[in-house]
């Protein structure tokens, strides 16, 4: 029996394009079915800034209302790197950008309060979905940002408490 050999792995461009096209089809179906009754947000987070920008371009063409961009996963960027990542994304789209902090899905990476405060001054970054499950962190985002910046809960169990403390709403998984 031959042992597997190590070698470079090339991403399959056709499969990636197919996946992007399928995402766009899903967004279009959701937009069609909701008939503008509710805003439609597209989750466009990816490993690279370039990939997020490409997905945002597709989301913009389809006509979604905003994009939600999770922090990059599998890597541990610094706050400066995350700042440049999110600013490049926000600068490259006309769509409102919602930051998405979900440490449980990104190897423990949490957007710091200082970083969110700094990013909240960008005219195209309109809010953050906080799925940390840490109400203290959510409250820190609320206290550190202006009233027009939407801090949204991502944990169902914290919606009520978050709203009491000033969160603007929730984007739930259920």
Predicted segments, located by residue:
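Active-site beta->alpha loop and helix N-cap motifs at the rims of alpha/beta catalytic domains
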Residues: 1-108
